[in-house]
């Protein structure tokens, strides 16, 4: 019974605290209704260069293939760099020769 009272007290305190924070926010919080476009503290929504650039990028359907390749070449380059490439056959053979453990030294070696 005492445990339920503690849980109820915690719930009530957290609810009252959240209501207090909604109606009396800290002084450094500025609500959108308090903004004026003429003040120095106004920051436009797309203030980052990536956002403005992506907003200006035309849709892929309206571009020619050459322009499309030019626009997305950094993306294609990063995909090419990060993709896993298959190893050449001679390199695989060299790795097998260098890293292979002879059969007689393996733990599962069986004598016939």
From Swiss-Prot:
Signals that turn on the gene: Part of the khtSTU operon. Induced by salt stress at alkaline pH.
GO cellular component, one term: plasma membrane
Superkingdom of origin organism: Bacteria
Polar residues composition bias: residue spans: 47-60
Keyword Zinc-finger: no
Keywords: Cell membrane, Membrane
Region (Disordered): 42-64
Membrane topology, as annotated: Peripheral membrane protein
Major subcellular site: membrane
Coiled coil ranges: none
Protein's cellular compartments: Cell membrane
General function of this protein: Modulates the activity of the potassium/proton antiporter KhtU. Involved in protection of the cell from methylglyoxal, a toxic by-product of glycolysis.
Name of the protein: K(+)/H(+) antiporter modulator KhtS
Gene: khtS
């Amino acid at each position: 019974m005492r445990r339920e009272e503690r849980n109820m007290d915690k719930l009530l305190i957290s609810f009252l605290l959240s209501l207090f924070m909604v109606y009396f926010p800290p002084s450094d919080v500025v609500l959108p209704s308090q903004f004026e476009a003429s003040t120095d503290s106004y920051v436009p929504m797309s203030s980052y260069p990536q956002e403005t650039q992506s907003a200006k990028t035309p849709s892929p359907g309206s571009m020619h293939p050459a322009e499309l390749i030019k626009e997305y070449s950094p993306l294609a380059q990063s995909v090419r760099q990060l993709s896993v490439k298959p190893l050449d056959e001679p390199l695989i053979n060299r790795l097998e020769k260098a890293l292979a453990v002879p059969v007689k030294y393996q733990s599962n070696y069986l004598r016939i």
